[in-house]
Every structure is written in C-alpha cells, then in structure tokens.
Regions:
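Helix-loop boundary and gating motifs at the non-cytosolic
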Residues: 1-52, 205-247
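Juxtamembrane intracellular "pre-TM" segments in multi-pass secondary transporters
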Residues: 1-3, 178-212
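Hydrophobic core of transmembrane alpha-helices in multi-pass small-molecule transporters
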Residues: 14, 80, 91-107, 295-311
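Helix-to-loop junctions at the C-terminal end of transmembrane segments
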Residues: 52-65, 150, 255-269, 354
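C-terminal ends and interior cores of transmembrane alpha-helices
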Residues: 75-88, 279-292
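Cytoplasmic helix-loop-helix junction between adjacent transmembrane helices
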Residues: 98-136
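Symmetry-related core transmembrane helices of the 12-TM Major Facilitator Superfamily/SLC fold
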Residues: 157-175, 361-378
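Helix-loop junctions on the cytosolic side of multi-pass membrane transporters
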Residues: 162, 170-188, 378-386
Length: 386
C-alpha cells in the first residue's frame, strides 16, 4: 500500500507540474493582446486568492478529507487552463486567475499530506530528493516543449497538452488511497481550530523560521519565474533558447539533488544548507546584474537552481518533522500562504518602482531586501535539531 501510494504521488507530482505555458505565460498573454497592466492584475488576482484561501482550504482538508480537497483543486486548474485557451476578456481572465489561486490552495498540502502520512520520517529526506527530481524533470520537459511552442506561436497545442495532463492528474488522484488515521491523529484533528494552528506556529521557532524563509524567498524569486522568458528576450535570447536553458537548468538541479543523501551523511546538514542557501543568493545576483555577459546568464541561472536543489530537501525535511501530523495540511497551507504574501509584496513593490526602473533592476533590489530577512531565518532554521 505504501509503495503504491508513493508511486502514485510521484506520478501526481510529474503530471500536476507539467505545464508548457508556465515559463511563457507572460509572453503568451502579450501575444494575445493583453497589456502589462492587465497581466500584472491577473498575477495579483491569483496570489491574493491563494493568500486568502490557503489556510481555510488546508483547514477544510484536515477536517473533511484531503483527497476531496485535492480533487476540487484539480478541477479548478482545468477551468483555469480552459479559460486561458478560450477567454479574451481581461476581467474574465482575472477571474480565471483567481480561480487558479483557489485551485492551488486546495491542492496545496492535501495530496502531499496523504503521501507524508504513508512513509516513515527517516525516509523523508531520500524521498524528498526523488520528489524534487520528478518535479524538475516535469518542469524541464514542459519548458523545453513550451519553448518550441512559444517560438512557433502554437499555443493552442501547448494549452491542449496542459489540459490533457491535468485530466490525467485527476485520474491519478482518484486512485491514491487515503488512509484513515488512527487514534494518534483522529482525535486531535476533529478538535483542531485556527487558534490551535496559530498557537502551534507561535510556539515553534522552526515553523516560524521556515515561514519567514518562504515569504522572503517568494519576494525575490516568484517574479523571476514569471518574467524569466521576458528577461532573456530582453537580452536577445529567443523562446527556444529560453526553453532549452530552463530544461537544462531543471535537469541539472534534479541530478545534483540526488547527491543530497550521500552529502549529508558526511557533512553537517545545517552548515551544508546554509552554504548552499547563501551561494544561491549570490548566483542569482550575478544573473540579474545588467552588466553580466549574455553568454553567462544561462550558467548563473543553472547554478543558482542547483544550489537550491542541494539544500531544499534538508530544509523541507526539517519543516515536515516539525509539523504536527494532525494539522499538517493546514501548516503546509500556511507555508504556501507565505509564498503568496511574498509574491503580493513584490508585485506591489514592482508597481511602485516600475516607472523609474526596469524589471531586472527591480528584481535585483528585491533580492537584496529579501536577503536581509532570509539569511537570519536560514541560520535559525538550520541551527535547530529535530
């Protein structure tokens, strides 16, 4: 049963993250005639919706069923992709992006919590590495395909493929068994409340540090993903080159991430995570500096994601071990909510500075601000022992 759940979950990770439009979304929206103001409004609608609904949907999943929550979210994502394909009204698409935020909130933590409950804690680091590999492989394949699709302007084909992938995701989730938890989790779960979730966070420095890291990291990196293709296009790289760069970057990250179990067996996990986290910030700064030669941009982008893939499984396993099983969905949802907060703050920051600076400079400034919060939280998180 456990092996079947893990296999189905990894399949879910691959299919749910397959999106040919992801790295070329802003390019596509410009292609069909939307202004940058409209595009920014859509992005904000998604993040605000996710921010508002992350905790309520996680709470509902913990109380009434994680699998049902995940299925509702996947159906919502199907609606979002269909809207991207067919809708050309800015207001309706803003609504579709809000639907995406709701869908992501429903999926966030729900299926993952079923998977976490099916494996032992000492397996999490190893399986987290496998999960990251599957995650990056899905992104790499879809990014490479998306680059060719964007270059040819064949977005109908790409969005149709994304819809098919989401339908297959729905089938996989239906097949995932949701085990009824026994005495250790059932009783606390039924008595859980938002106040209990808040108290759990307030009394746990690991959770607080993880949430601060998620928020500050989103402030610096979410928009980097959203505007990645436009950034490279501004430096003279076409969509195919962008897609191939993303694919190489993701596959390199996944491959390097496989060495984490071996590496942490011989080095201090906390120190290893701190070094990788700080190196990632430095490499990202080199990618964003306007004077960096164009031919070095793919190199720095690949290396910064490799650094992240090396320490992410360690950071996440610390968070997973600190999250109480009876409210794990809710805590994972809070984690996702912090990502939404960071993204919203960046888009507001971008709106305030867009008239006096370009997106590359704004991202560089955001990276510097985020580092002031991220680095202390990283040190606090990795100095704890669970």
């Amino acid at each position: 049963m456990k092996n079947r759940t893990v296999l189905l979950y990894m399949t879910f990770v691959f299919l749910s993250n397959f999106s040919t439009i992801l790295y070329f979304l802003t390019v596509y929206l410009e292609f069909v005639g939307f202004s940058m103001v409209a595009i920014s409004s859509m992005m904000i609608a998604c993040q605000v919706s996710k921010f508002i609904l992350e905790v309520p949907t996680g709470y509902i999943a913990d109380r009434f069923g994680r699998k049902v929550s995940g299925l509702v979210g996947i159906v919502g994502m199907l609606g979002y992709y269909v809207a991207l394909l067919l809708v050309r009204s800015p207001l309706l698409l803003i609504g579709a992006f809000a639907l995406k935020g709701f869908a992501v909130a429903c999926v966030s933590g729900s299926i993952e919590a079923i998977y976490i409950d099916s494996v032992s804690q000492d397996q999490l680091v190893r399986l987290n590495v496998v999960e990251r590999f599957v995650f990056y492989a899905s992104y790499a394949i879809s990014a490479c395909v998306g680059g060719f699709i964007s270059s040819a302007g064949a977005y109908l084909i790409g969005l149709s493929a994304d819809i098919i992938a989401m339908v297959l995701t729905l089938v996989v989730v239906v097949c995932i068994p949701e085990m009824r938890r026994g005495d250790t989790a059932a009783t606390p779960e039924h008595g859980m409340s938002p106040q209990m979730i808040g108290a759990a966070i307030a009394g746990n420095d690991i959770l607080r540090s993880a949430f601060i890291m998620d928020c500050s990291q989103a402030f610096a990196f979410v928009a980097l993903e959203d505007f990645f293709s436009l950034l490279l296009a501004g430096r003279g790289m076409n969509a195919v080159a962008s897609g191939v760069t993303i694919a190489v970057q993701l596959l390199a990250s996944a491959s390097m991430g496989l060495i984490v179990p071996c590496a942490i067996a011989h080095v201090d996990k906390g120190r290893f995570a701190r070094i990788c986290g700080i190196v990632r910030l430095f490499l990202t700064a080199l990618f964003l500096i306007p004077l960096t030669p164009v031919y070095l941009l793919p190199v720095f982008y690949v290396l910064q994601t490799v650094a992240y893939s090396l320490f992410a499984p360690i950071k996440y396993s610390v968070f997973q071990n600190a999250a109480d099983s009876s409210m794990r969905c809710s805590l994972i949802s809070v984690q996702s909510q912090m990502v939404a907060v960071g993204a919203i703050l960046f888009y507001l920051f971008n709106a305030a500075l867009s008239s006096i600076a370009g997106i590359r400079v704004i991202l560089l400034v955001a990276l510097g601000i985020a580092s002031l919060v991220y680095i202390p939280a990283l040190f606090r998180l990795t100095s704890q022992r669970t």
